[in-house]
Amino acid sequence: MSNLNTLLEQAITIPEPNASDVGQLFMLHHGVGIDAQAMVSVGEHLAKIFPQAHIVSIQAPHACDMGRGAQWFSVQGVTEENRGERVSAQMPLFLSAIEAWQRKTGIGPEATALVGFSQGAIMSLESTQQQKSVAARVVSLSGRFVALPHVPELGTTLHMIHGKKDPVIHYGFCVKAAEHLVEEGADLTADVLPDLSHEINSEVLELMTKRLKEHIPAEVWRKAQAEALSSTPKG
């Protein structure tokens, strides 16, 4: 519980919205070796586009073992074989923080979006592989799944943005996961930017907001189609 309390205390709200107007919750998750402050510019950009959103940047719970910043799990000695164990060990706390902010704001999973960069994106993506989804949308910036994923719970939309020049997490992980998920019928967008490294720049911010604003989730289409069919005169 102390770790959860610390996460809640160290989170940065950007900005503090009018409580009567709040209709969405964005939760931002930074990469390894940096902190919640590093995602403030992302939150400020989102606040301009979504003025009725509650936007909070979460500080990872552990001091980074590489000398500065914070982390969800250590990347020292991380391999394809042990990455999943490290993510799984931190997932209960990650989910608890999301649920705590949902209770605090009165906003449910259907109006929650997770935006993660690097390790924060890994945790955000992997949250969709749990038994119950905690967010309707997940934005992965320079992230990856631990392994080939299954389709998230119905209603969850993924937006994956990656740089072809990323030296930290190869863009191939994004492409492979996206191709697999499309084949399985998942709702997602995936963009690989040819000149992008392991970073969040203005091009990424503009593309992210474009996807969030303009992509109509498949679940919305399904409901609209069902309503149209039910109202069609018989005979």
Write out the residue ranges for each language-model feature:
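Short, proline-enriched alpha-helix->beta-strand connector loops that line the catalytic pocket
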Residues: 23, 110, 153-158, 184
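C-terminal catalytic histidine-bearing segment of alpha/beta-hydrolase fold enzymes
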Residues: 172-235
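Short beta-to-alpha linker loops that shape the active-site pocket of alpha/beta-hydrolase fold enzymes
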Residues: 59-63, 144, 196
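Primarily recognizes the serine-hydrolase "nucleophile elbow" in alpha/beta-hydrolase
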Residues: 110-155
